[in-house]
Amino acid sequence: MEIGLREWLILIGIIVIAGILFDGWRRMRGGKGKLKFRLDRSYSNLPDEEGSAEVLGPSRVLDTQKEPELDESDLPSLSAPAREREREQKPAKATKRGKRAAEMQPQGDLDLVAEPREPDLFADADDDFAGDNNRNSGFAAAGSAAKELPPVEEVLVISVISRDEGGFKGPALLQNILESGLRFGEMDIFHRHESMAGHGEVLFSMANAVKPGIFDLDDIDHFSTRAVSFFLGLPGPRHPKQAFDVMVAAARKLAHELNGELKDDQRSVLTAQTIEHYRQRIVEFERRALTQKR
């Protein structure tokens, strides 16, 4: 069998490629041995204890310091905005807070600031809310704090009138409004605060729609009334639209469970359209407030 030039060239190429691969493998193996030898020599020259302390020491110190720094810095960063807001609302009371817990500070301040606002709401309400003597005493108790509050410009009123001739009975009425989060307070009427427990700013209030407009808890078992009125003043809560929704829910619950009828501030039947009109009044008030600030 004769071998042509083409076959010889292919055979020579294969031999050359095999030689190149073998040479590369030999060099690579020799290089690994030298590198390992150099690393062994470099580590053998380092001190056993001091060298390891210098290499590992800094990383351990940094790791142990990170967690305490983050934990300690997070706590003041969360409470600082609340403290600054309290100082702006009640600068005269800043030095009397002492060692109150961070959660209790806004609740106490909001109670003192928001509750005196109710006399203004009551004074602007319907004649059915007549309680002149109680309003005057409320103003006297408020003192200088009431003077710092902005005047109430608008009052949103929802009345619940009993369909029964006997009216709303005291025990049933009390149980119903307590379930809605209202608590007995300033001016002998009920207030709904931010917290269901009765802490935080006042969102809205509920008064007796029959003179003298108050509730007597000592005689609540024998108490009855033909109507009650929920009212929300503007300016008032920080989030008036949400507060209004809570007020509507409380009024609807009372009307549904105690056989009452919802009325608006004109003593007309409260409809979905009327509720939407109330919401629009809130939006317009907020828009005017922003315009005045600018």
From Swiss-Prot:
Gene3D superfamilies from the UniProt entry: ZipA, C-terminal FtsZ-binding domain
Residues in the signal sequence: none
Domain of life of the organism encoding this protein: Bacteria
Official protein name in the record: Cell division protein ZipA
Stretches assigned to the Periplasmic side: 1
Family: Belongs to the ZipA family.
GO terms for biological process, alphabetical: division septum assembly; FtsZ-dependent cytokinesis
Membrane topology: Single-pass type I membrane protein
Principal location class: membrane
A Pfam entry, by short name: ZipA_C
Residue intervals on the Cytoplasmic side: 23-294
Annotated NCBIfam families: septum_zipA
Amino acid composition bias (Basic and acidic residues), ranges on this chain: 82-91
Compartments, as annotated in UniProt: Cell inner membrane
Coiled coil: none
Residue spans crossing the bilayer: 2-22
Organism, as annotated: Pseudomonas putida (strain W619)
Keywords for the protein's UniProt record, in alphabetical order: Cell cycle, Cell division, Cell inner membrane, Cell membrane, Membrane, Transmembrane, Transmembrane helix
Purpose of the protein: Essential cell division protein that stabilizes the FtsZ protofilaments by cross-linking them and that serves as a cytoplasmic membrane anchor for the Z ring. Also required for the recruitment to the septal ring of downstream cell division proteins.
Region (Disordered) residue spans: 47-107
Oligomeric and partner information: Interacts with FtsZ via their C-terminal domains.
Annotated GO CC locations: cell division site; plasma membrane
